[in-house]
């Protein structure tokens, strides 16, 4: 089964003919379910958010050295146990993102073209905003969802580790989440942030592309 989606803002009218560049996307087959498609779409989003937008990059590099592949963590992140008590805004975010992934897909080419034409005419014969879900929602995740990110990441980490997460590793993971948040700058409300006490050389860790475990880079405690 396939569906259709517009590529960016590649649509216009030429000599009274409406044209729209698009993709035909395979969303299921005899060996690939629709749920598999959504799983791949979630992975694509998270890899972009972490490795292009640097969403919690310190944390994810750290847990990689705990033996947890990013794909495994991302899968847990998007499939929380709905019978457990999770932050409402977290559940709302992943549900909204899923709806956005599905809304960009159209059952037929004709539906896709009709939707693009509707947007074009509503904007006075001009294109609308580009559908850049990875960028838009990745930015939202990095800057607008901080109230739930830390407890959710730490809870998933503990669950993936089957309760065997040491207090030292939990504290370090928590510190690295705080470090990522300290790196963010609110240009509308610039204020001085409280420094972190850190006893691992994260600067050289990053410089060396996170090749070795952070535990190997112990140093005297410094303010960062």
Language-model regions, residue ranges each:
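Charge-dense, extended regions
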Residues: 113-224
